[in-house]
């Protein structure tokens, strides 16, 4: 979640704006990601089927999100990608599924390399790398 308010026009400008959101619940996947809170922290066990489950469902999810956002151009390489890096297999399958150029998931791959899959907060690292990439352009 990214929260904020209206920026002060003379001194601030938003880095991101959320225009649409969507979620999908996939039946019979409740054991696919198993999180445990213990005395030493949180640990997760990811099912070996997770990359395939994502690959099988990501296109429908993206079509739904793109439709809600009111976009019509389905050229995935023209889109901005901020993907939670659940693991290399997940990123590889997304890249293949959408025929993405290798740089489209670059921020996700760097975040995964630097921090690993640090649960849901990993997406914040991805967004930070995207900001850094945009400043270099």
Question: Model features per residue range: what roles?
Answer:
Residues 1-67:
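Condensing-enzyme catalytic core mediating Claisen C-C bond formation in acyl metabolism
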């Amino acid at each position: 979640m990214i929260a904020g308010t209206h920026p002060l026009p003379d001194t601030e400008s938003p880095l991101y704006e959320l225009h649409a959101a969507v979620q999908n619940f996939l039946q019979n996947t409740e054991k696919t990601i198993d999180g445990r809170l213990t005395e030493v922290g949180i640990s997760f066990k990811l099912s070996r089927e997770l990359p395939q489950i994502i690959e099988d469902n990501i296109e429908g999810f993206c079509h739904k999100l793109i439709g809600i956002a009111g976009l019509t151009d389905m050229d995935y390489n023209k889109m901005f990608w901020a993907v939670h890096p659940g693991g290399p297999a997940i990123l590889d399958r997304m890249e293949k599924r959408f025929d993405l150029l290798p740089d489209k998931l670059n921020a996700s791959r760097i975040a995964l390399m630097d921090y690993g899959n640090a649960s849901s907060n990993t997406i914040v690292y991805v967004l930070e790398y995207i900001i850094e990439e945009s400043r270099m352009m």
